[in-house]
């Protein structure tokens, strides 16, 4: 089991596709190098931004394998391994465990509409069947379930549940969880627009970010400045993060992020159905913001 303490800005990597919708492995490898060279603290393959739900199991395994190989332990990896099927989640989590990733990111099960007890038993089953650190992924805007703090604290009480990624934007949640459980755990926000507030008010330890695909250095600089008590520098960087986050979610993620990366790095904006590429109106929004931030 990894002993790495997980904190900082972890980029939720896009999965680049070629025009025929196959995985562009060469571009994915270059994207990882770009992230690491821009001081990102960690990487998250096969999360929401990585379009994991449209990957076959074989493709999923290849993306994780390639990320581990290219990264070569230079930064920690939290691998997405969740689904709404407990047995499938166990299968994926055992796979990422075999590659010695630093943690698995397990989403709250969606679509089935499980009860509180069902959610707990899902995480307990994955926990008990594996030996890799697990991070809860709470994103109710996609799962239609927002577990209450008591339930989250109960899940966090399991020994190898080491943290949570909370994408609600609720900066009070970390404080509430700390009151409910006597255990040190990683507190990642998944809401780019409120990441600095999550640090300042909630005691957050990091962000798993879609926006950092586009601005890894600005994002890591914000984190580093805040924890070095350089608040003005952190706020200046956060201004860019906040502005960009507003346009990168103008349409379903990761379509706007992929379009931005096509303008900055020449990466294909191709997404897999049922997602589609940006409308012309939204393309213009992204282009204008990138110009405003001097990114193109």
UniProtKB/Swiss-Prot annotation:
Belongs to the DapA family. Keywords: Amino-acid biosynthesis, Cytoplasm, Diaminopimelate biosynthesis, Lyase, Lysine biosynthesis, Schiff base. It catalyses: L-aspartate 4-semialdehyde + pyruvate = (2S,4S)-4-hydroxy-2,3,4,5-tetrahydrodipicolinate + H2O + H(+). Its EC number is 4.3.3.7. The gene is dapA. It comes from Ehrlichia canis (strain Jake). Gene3D superfamilies: Aldolase class I. One of its GO terms (biological process) is lysine biosynthetic process via diaminopimelate. Catalyzes the condensation of (S)-aspartate-beta-semialdehyde [(S)-ASA] and pyruvate to 4-hydroxy-tetrahydrodipicolinate (HTPA). This is 4-hydroxy-tetrahydrodipicolinate synthase. The keyword Cell membrane does not apply. Pyruvate binds at residues 49, 208. It comes from the Bacteria. GO terms for cellular component: cytosol. It is an enzyme of class 4 (lyase).
């Amino acid at each position: 089991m990894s002993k790495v303490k997980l904190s900082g800005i972890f980029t939720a990597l896009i999965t680049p596709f070629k025009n025929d919708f196959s995985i562009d492995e060469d571009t994915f490898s270059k994207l990882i190098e770009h992230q690491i060279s821009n001081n990102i603290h960690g990487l998250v393959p096969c999360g929401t931004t990585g379009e994991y739900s449209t990957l076959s199991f074989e493709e999923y395994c290849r993306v994780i394998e390639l990320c581990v190989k290219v990264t070569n332990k230079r930064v920690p990896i939290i691998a997405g391994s969740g689904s709404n099927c407990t047995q499938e989640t166990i299968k994926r989590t055992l796979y990422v465990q075999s590659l010695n990733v630093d943690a698995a990111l397990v989403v709250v099960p969606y679509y089935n509409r499980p009860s509180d007890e069902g959610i707990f038993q899902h995480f307990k089953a994955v926990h008990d069947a594996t030996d890799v650190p697990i991070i809860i992924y709470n994103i109710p805007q996609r799962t239609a379930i927002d577990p209450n703090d008591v339930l989250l604290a109960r899940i966090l009480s399991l020994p190898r549940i080491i943290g949570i990624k909370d994408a609600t934007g609720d900066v009070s949640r970390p404080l509430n969880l700390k009151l409910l459980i006597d255990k040190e755990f990683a507190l990642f926000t998944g809401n780019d627009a409120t990441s600095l507030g999550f640090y300042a008010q909630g005691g957050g330890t990091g962000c798993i970010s879609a926006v950092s695909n586009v601005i890894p250095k600005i994002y890591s600089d914000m984190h580093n400045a805040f924890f070095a008590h350089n608040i003005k520098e952190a706020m200046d960087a956060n201004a860019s993060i906040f502005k960009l986050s507003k346009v990168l979610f103008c349409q379903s993620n990761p379509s706007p992020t992929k379009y931005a990366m096509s303008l900055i790095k020449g990466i294909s904006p191709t997404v897999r159905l049922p997602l589609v590429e940006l409308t012309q109106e939204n393309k213009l929004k992204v282009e204008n913001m990138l110009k405003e931030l001097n990114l193109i």
